[in-house]
A protein has these predicted regions:
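Carbohydrate-associated surface elements
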Residues: 104
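N-terminal glycine/serine-rich phosphate-binding loop of ATP-dependent small-molecule kinases
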Residues: 1-98, 108, 113, 150
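Glycine-rich phosphate-binding segment of PLP-dependent enzymes
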Residues: 111-117, 192-193
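A generic structural signal for ordered alpha-helices
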Residues: 2-3, 30, 34, 118-119, ...
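Gly/Ser/Thr-rich active-site cleft segment
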Residues: 11-13, 121-193
């Protein structure tokens, strides 16, 4: 019988965690790697995309190294993790904004205004009362107008990792359907983002 394995990678705020499972759901190995962050002042929480991506690669390597020769039997990978955040990238998948999760509250005045003006629309169209991505994008474009000119796509952290790992064209950037409501840019009935 063929030895089929699957790897899952959790893109957490503090740690990247990976697990490899067999077809019976048994965990064969697990690995973790810390994620660096910067907290220069209250309400400011920065995680640089390249640092996050480096942690992902190191964690995956720990997992495959622990598997030894069985690493060749990993048939698929799945990514899960942080949902309430935002990252904008340029046309080459370079981080423009850093990963800005809900701990980074610099966007709050923009979120408050958007919710005051569009709360019903967000709930009825996007299915959310916490539209993180659109308020964070408005904040970033307002506070960093020059940097924002480089933005090609806005993604969740899993989309960033998938894009960089797969070296896909930026036009093929994706978002997991389970995360779409957090964006504030989604029409959940039409499954459009």
């Amino acid at each position: 019988m063929k030895d089929i394995l699957f790897m899952t990678v959790d893109l957490g705020t503090s740690f990247i965690k990976a697990g490899v499972y067999d077809t019976e759901g048994n965990c064969i190995i697990s690995a973790s790697e810390p994620v660096n962050d910067e907290r220069p002042r209250p309400g400011m929480f920065i995680q640089r995309g390249e640092d996050l991506f480096g942690s992902v690669l190191r964690c995956i390597k720990k997992g495959t190294d622990a598997l030894g020769d069985r690493a060749k039997n990993v048939e698929a990978m799945a990514f899960t993790g942080q949902m309430a955040g935002f990252m904008a990238v340029d046309k080459d998948w370079n981080d423009v904004t850093t990963w800005s999760c809900s701990i980074d509250t610099r966007y709050t005045p923009f979120a408050d205004r958007q919710m005051k003006e569009y709360a019903t629309d967000f709930l009825e169209i996007s299915g959310t009362n916490a539209p993180q991505m659109c308020s964070k994008l408005e904040w970033f474009c307002h506070d960093f107008p020059e940097e924002s000119k480089r933005i090609a796509k806005c993604v969740m952290i899993s989309g960033y990792v998938l894009g960089k790992l797969g070296q896909i064209p930026i036009e093929e950037a994706c978002i997991d359907g389970s995360l779409i409501a957090w964006s504030g840019y989604a029409d959940i009935r039409k499954a459009e983002w």
